[in-house]
Amino acid sequence: MKIAALNMCVMILFRRKAIALGQKAKLMQERENPGIKTVRPMKDGVIADFNAAEMMIRGFIKQVNSKRRSLFTPNIKMVVGIPSGSTEVEIRAVRDSSEHAGGREVYLIYEPMASALGIGLDVEAPKGNMVVDIGGGTTEIAVISLGGIVCQDSIKVAGDVFTNDIQMYLRQQHNIKVGAITAERIKIAIGAVIPDLDEEPDPYQVTGPNLMTAHPVHASISYQEIAHCLDKSVGRIETGILHVLEQTPPELYSDIVENGIHLAGGGSLLRGLAKRLTEKVSIPFHVADDPLRAVARGTCLALKNTENYTFLMR
């Protein structure tokens, strides 16, 4: 089995044909000319453009099967992660796109469950495990026990919102216009959610046009500024976590207090996040090993063991 690690669902189209996908497309994003179009088939964790999503999945399949030569269409089995708050219409769109792209056996798994599998939690155990997966489009919060999701919340506040927060902050406070790619680099380099880190990253030097004059402007951005501009968005995630804990049955709540809450997804790499959430909720938070790929690892495990994990999927 081959895993294609694709960090970003971005496509570059030329005359309605995909010419770049994933990381290659990301390098071209915001640098295209009028004849080339950037498309993000997914928005807030669900399909926003059905045809583009189908092309994207076909591209993924082609990358995985690039060295295989056959006269026959390969029998492709797929497991696709979906937000736990997906509607039936959104779920059907994912399944249809996957089948039209060449999937013969298509299974869907909720992302918090996939994340828990990827972290290494025993999702079938009769005890409560809580997962907070902060992805690109959504933050998935769920309590899992006996192979099922007991209570959950899916919040449309995650990495993309953080990136937009940074862009808006630079416009308002520094009068600098930056693109999403630059804002994401800032987020990765100095992204933080508390103003007093033990290990402080160096300020990020950013250059961009002045909004009023279009003259080049240089600014030094500190991690404290990023913590300030992300404060409200992180606060919405805190509210979601508390909301799910309020719904959690007492016995499972006791398990969570004992074992802590597990953080996954790229957003969990924000500096100081586990500390801030621990202080807010009064329950320990643990960042998973390699949290960026937790969902990918979980879907891979589910794909390898579809016979044993059918009760986890739909």
State where each predicted segment sits:
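Nucleotide/phosphate-binding catalytic cleft detector across ATP-hydrolyzing
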Residues: M1-I134, A142-I261, S268-R314
